[in-house]
Amino acid sequence: MQYSVATADGLSGPPSGAYTLPTFKFQPRRESIDWRRISAVDVDRVARELDVATLQENIAGVTFCNLDREVCNHCRQPVDPVLLKVLRLAQLIIEYLLHCQDCLSASVAQLEARLQASLGQQQRGQQELGRQADELKGVREESRRRRKMISTLQQLLLQTGAHSYHTCHLCDKTFMNATFLRGHIQRRHAGMAEVGKQKQEQQLGEVLEELRAKLKWTQGELEAQREAERQRQAQELEMIRQREIEAKKKFDEWKEKERSKLYGEIDKLKQLFWDEFKTVANQNSTLEEKLKVLQSYSMTESHLGSLRDEESEERLKHAQELQALREKMDIQKTEWKRKMKALHEERAAERRQLQEENERLHVTLSQDQKKAAAQSQRHINALRAQLQEQARLIESQEETIQTLSFRRMEEVQEVPKAVVTEEDSSEEELEASLEEQQEQRKVLAALRNNPAWLKQFRPILEDTLEEKLEGMGIKRGTKGISAQTVRRLEPLLRTQREQTARSFREFLSLREKLNQEVSSRAKKRWEGTAVVPQPDGQPPVKSQRTTLATREVRPKTRTLTVALPSKPAEPSTSTPRGHSSHGPGLTQVSTPIPRPRVHGPSSTPVSPGPGLSTPPFSSEEEPEGDVVQRVSLQPPKVLPRSAPQPEDNWGWSDSETSEESAQSPGKGSDGLASSATLVQSMVKNLEKQLETPAKKPSGGVNMFLRPNTALQRSSTPARKTQLSEDESDLEISSLEDLSHDLGPKGKPTPLSHSKLPEKFDASPWSSGSRPRIPGW
């Protein structure tokens, strides 16, 4: 509630207007004042902040309180009468002002109600005005339209003139319109009108019948036309369908032709890539053979030592051949780059053409065609990957050739050549063996001065081996190969061996020469020695030279070692090879050492063979298929024993990863037993000559063990020897010849990796037999 400022006129009488004030009367005051509430009010704050709410709360208590009985708290005297009068006057004024405020509020409410009623009436008037305006607009439009119609009729009347009159056909009277004419006929000519009406009805009936007949005829014609149209549309649809079928048939024929053409091109491209791949493989094998021939000139191995050519002309010739090989490799690389570029351009053009054709026929291509296109693309990508892999293989082989040639030149300068002469007497052979020991000491000293040579070529040879295996279809990380893969790789390996033999012109003659030499020496030594019989159950002692070690071709896999005695008819099949070092020209020859008998159920311990071994991977001419073939030649009853071998003091353990397995006596042919006896007699003869080895230099390795040392170590397992990476295919071919000569009766049972007996717990496959190099 708000307070209004009252003027003198407002206080003296009622406000102006029709509104009349209600009856006013002052109320009696009987309430006592609440001093505590009054004391809590801050008057200054209320005046400063215009706190009307506080005034509204206290207005009733102040206006209607009684102060007559109030006394002073200090002096206990009543209130001053004058002050009391002023307070009562103020209370009356406030009460009157409240009454005026109520009257004004009621007046304002009444006026607001009247205002709302006026506004509603005004709105209704505006709506009525709008409606009337719409009606006026419609009336005006109707009036305008009628005026136009009247003017049009007037013009027509003026134009027609007298012809617009209606004349009675029964009399001469004329009327303005047809209504008047009909009225005239009904009044004057009633009978004739009925006759005329009947005639008109009859005429109308005839016309109606005629129209019905025409309608029926028209409907019949329309139905015939519709039927003809349907037949025509059906014929057109049939023709369109026939054309679509023919077009689809032609498209299918064209599609089949294109598909056959595409497959033919893909087959041609595959055949081309395969021919190129074979050509490159043959060239690589030829280059590797030439490289090995160059290396064999600097290191030719035999039973008694290393044969070296001292002529400088040969070295110059080898250097020239190496340079020619490098030039051929450069020419081949350039040719391959050109061919690769042409193939890429051709494939890009074909791809663009196929993409355009695919975009044009994308709507009609079926799912099998899309699969065929994706398969062709995968074939193309696979062929491209093979080409890239072949290019990388060529680059790696070139780097290998350069590295090996550089190493060969350095080692040839450092290592003096030793010429082993063929002497028949035992004294000359002993002198040759002593010279060979001195040569080996020099080699070890050279390697000890530069031990980095041992580890320089390991990554290169590993990469070369991995790439060659991938080129043969064996992926990286494969733990083994199946029999089907072996059968698939056998023709390729056989072809490579034949190509290797053809590329090395002196291969057959050299093998025959070695066969004759070994046969003659064996016969001479056999004549001078007596055959020592072996007790039953004791296997014949074999030379460490006759142990052929298979090579590890995949990471973390180990293969069996085949120990085969040579036959008397073909001594070349067991031609021993010296343990080769990591580099060409660094050879080492070990003499056969007797192995003492150890009583056991079926085990034959082997004395630890001295010598150095090569990294556990095959050369370029011995792929994985040869490994499997060599493993299959081992007899079934074999219990190999292996023991960890101490490492040399100059880091030779990086390449010592092969183990040695001994062959137990079993059911074999008489030829094998006789050859074992022959080898045993040769061992005993050589053992007598090597009882006192030469003095070992400081830091050297004793390559020949004494017999008593062999007896002391009879219980320790032996490790396998291993073929070096620079050996030729002579051992492989000899082993293959031996496998063919064994025949169906003497052929040993293949011992696969997956069918090992349970007693092979201490086999070379066990992880505890020897610490292995990580990744090999």
Curated annotation (Swiss-Prot):
Record PROSITE patterns: ZINC_FINGER_C2H2_1, ZINC_FINGER_C2H2_2
InterPro entries: DZIP1_N, DZIP_RILPL, Znf_C2H2_type
A single Gene Ontology CC term: axoneme
GO molecular function, one term: zinc ion binding
Keywords per UniProt: Cell projection, Cilium, Coiled coil, Cytoplasm, Cytoskeleton, Metal-binding, Phosphoprotein, Zinc, Zinc-finger
Residue ranges, compositional bias (Polar residues): 652-683, 709-721
UniProt zinc finger (C2H2-type) residues: 166-189
Compositionally biased intervals (Low complexity): 600-618
Superkingdom assignment: Eukaryota
Modified residues (Phosphoserine): S425, S426
UniProt-annotated stretches for the region Disordered: 520-776
Entry keyword annotation includes Oxidoreductase: no
Coiled coil region boundaries: 196-450
A UniProt-annotated Pfam family: Dzip-like_N
Feature: compositional bias, Basic and acidic residues: 685-694
Localization of this protein: Cytoplasm, Cytoskeleton, Cilium basal body; Cytoplasm, Cytoskeleton, Microtubule organizing center, Centrosome, Centriole
Any single GO BP term: neural tube patterning
Record carries keyword Phosphoprotein: yes
Main location group: cytoplasm
Subunit organization: Interacts with SEPTIN2.
Protein family per UniProt: Belongs to the DZIP C2H2-type zinc-finger protein family.
The protein's role, per its UniProt record: Involved in primary cilium formation. Probably acts as a transition zone protein required for localization of PKD1/PC1 and PKD2/PC2 to the ciliary membrane.
Name by which UniProt lists this protein: Cilium assembly protein DZIP1L
Organism, as annotated: Rattus norvegicus
